[in-house]
């Protein structure tokens, strides 16, 4: 029986709740199940890599990030998670390069309204 879209969303939401409540291992299990079923989108793969990283599994996080990159999911958050994983693996030069890529790709902050615009 295939997983319904609602069930998929529920697993993703539960994984997020686990991650936010300092249970990265449980989050990784749920997200890895979605990946195994070929139901994980790029956001869920990035969250899986973050959960693996927070669970102390930096090598697994790098493997997940490699998969994400092959699927075209390279964005600012990808580089941020990658820099953290590389730093955990003590690959400082690569971590610095990934952080520079994150800074280059992150969205520009919204400009604060000027006094003339607020009056």
Could you say what each language-model-derived stretch is?
Residues 70-74, 83-109:
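TPR/TPR-like (Sel1-like) alpha-helical repeat modules
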């Amino acid at each position: 029986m295939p997983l319904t879209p609602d069930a998929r969303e529920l697993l993703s939401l539960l994984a997020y709740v686990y991650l936010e409540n300092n249970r990265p291992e449980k989050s990784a299990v749920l997200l890895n199940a979605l990946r195994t079923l070929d139901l994980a989108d790029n956001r869920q793969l990035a969250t899986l890599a973050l959960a693996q990283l927070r669970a102390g599994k930096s090598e697994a996080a790098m493997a997940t990030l490699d998969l994400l990159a092959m699927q075209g999911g390279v964005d600012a958050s990808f580089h941020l998670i990658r820099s953290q994983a590389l730093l955990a693996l003590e690959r400082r030069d690569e971590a610095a390069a990934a952080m520079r890529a994150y800074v280059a790709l992150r969205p520009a902050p919204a400009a604060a309204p000027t006094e003339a615009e607020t009056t």
